[in-house]
């Protein structure tokens, strides 16, 4: 592109050439051609600038800082005036340095620029493209080059650690049994102990007896199985609030906490998010650390959209459910007429937990007042919870209003749910 100086040169040169033709003046012709030649020469003398970006890490937690390094090199044989602009996602904050730099690079020179950003909200983010604007030696042309180098960063939710969860393991004859590193019924050898009157003779270790003349009994590793399926409501209604504090964010963090706790107990955990065709994800049940990574990867990218209810998600999950799978629903329960009927269908075959983020409390804190509309919605929600409780569901309301759920309060509610009388609503 031409600068204002180049436009002036072009206009003056063209005008002088036209006037020279009309006046048959050779001197004006030469002067006009000289001005135009400046434009031609500066266009030919292009600068060769190279730039690239390096992101310190590709996976961080919410609130952590990310260091970005830009490397610029002038491969031309003359000095270069360069403007750099690194495009950033709107959700991140610049905390140190700048993603826009103005540089003067010597011939063959290179420089290194750094800036630091903070990502307060989970998600998959792209950095780039990197825009490089350079001017020629005469300041007549400038060119903008887009370096198509895209960097990807995943910001994972920061979730509280739970102390307990009211889900019990059960003995199973399925082939997916999980070793718990405890003595009990199983097939893998665990240890030996002294014989106690009443122990079956087939468990006596006769080789040890032959060597020590003492009766010792084999112990085997206990194997339990507990499938749990977490269903996270990601409908459009769950984004009511601020980008950092809303029902979906509270639900995502709670889902991550529950999944982490159950997987540490060597259980098998699956996940479904529901709301619309673009945010419905299924993670089949599985054990171990890799399963937690799979679940967190889905929770990172889920967005609030769509109006599909709990019944649709339950139908998608049926092919993964065993008769004793524990279902854990995390939903504000607002404007979902399918919850009650779906809960009635699974009342006799599955343990059902409902954790409901208090969306009305979030709206009240934003609005600064509790209106009659909020009162009616909260009353309607309490009636739904009581109806779910009548089917045997274990329900609890999770307070909102904070970016990170109150772990002490959640642990207190879970401790209360762990008491023998489970059929009640915890407000």
Where do the protein language model's features map onto the residues?
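Acidic/proline-rich low-complexity IDRs
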Residues: 1-3, 129, 161, 421
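Short, structured coil/loop segments at alpha-helix boundaries
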Residues: 21, 25, 89-92, 156-158, ...
């Amino acid at each position: 592109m031409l600068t204002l100086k180049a436009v002036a040169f072009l206009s003056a040169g063209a005008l002088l050439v036209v006037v020279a033709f009309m006046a048959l003046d050779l001197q004006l012709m030469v002067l006009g051609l000289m001005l135009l030649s400046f434009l031609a020469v500066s266009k030919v003398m292009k600068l060769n600038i190279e730039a690239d970006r390096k992101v310190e890490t590709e996976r961080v937690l919410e609130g952590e800082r990310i260091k970005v390094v830009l490397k610029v090199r002038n491969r031309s044989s003359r000095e270069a005036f360069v403007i750099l602009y690194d495009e950033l996602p709107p959700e991140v904050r610049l905390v140190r340095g700048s993603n826009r730099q103005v540089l003067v690079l010597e011939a063959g020179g290179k420089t290194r620029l750094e800036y630091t950003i903070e990502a307060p909200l989970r998600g998959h983010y792209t950095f780039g493209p990197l825009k490089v604007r350079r001017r020629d030696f005469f300041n007549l042309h400038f060119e903008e080059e887009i370096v198509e180098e895209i960097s990807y960063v995943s910001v994972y939710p920061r979730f509280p650690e739970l102390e307990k969860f009211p889900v019990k393991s059960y003995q199973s004859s399925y082939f997916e049994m999980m070793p718990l590193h405890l003595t009990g019924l199983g097939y893998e050898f665990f240890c030996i102990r002294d014989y106690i009157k009443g122990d079956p003779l087939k468990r006596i270790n006769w080789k040890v007896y032959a060597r020590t003349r003492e009766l010792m009994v084999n112990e085997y590793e206990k194997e339990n199985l507990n499938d749990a399926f977490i269903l996270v409501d990601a409908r459009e209604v769950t984004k009511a609030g601020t980008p950092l504090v809303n029902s979906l964010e509270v639900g995502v963090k709670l889902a991550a906490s529950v999944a982490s706790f159950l997987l540490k107990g060597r259980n098998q955990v699956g996940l479904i998010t529901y709301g619309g065709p673009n945010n419905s994800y299924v993670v089949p049940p599985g054990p171990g650390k890799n399963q937690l990574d799979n679940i967190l990867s889905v929770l990172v990218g889920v967005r609030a959209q769509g109006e599909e209810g709990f019944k649709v998600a339950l139908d998608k999950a049926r092919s993964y459910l065993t008769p004793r799978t524990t279902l854990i629903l995390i939903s504000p329960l607002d404007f979902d007429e399918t919850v009650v009927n779906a809960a009635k269908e699974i009342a006799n075959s599955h343990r059902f937990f409902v954790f409901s983020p208090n969306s009305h409390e979030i709206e009240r804190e934003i609005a600064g007042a509790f209106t009659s509309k909020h009162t009616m919605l909260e009353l309607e929600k309490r009636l739904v919870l009581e109806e779910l409780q009548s089917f045997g569901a274990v329900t609890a309301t999770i307070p909102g209003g904070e970016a990170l759920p109150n772990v002490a309060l959640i642990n207190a509610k879970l401790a209360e749910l762990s008491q023998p009388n489970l059929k009640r609503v915890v407000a």
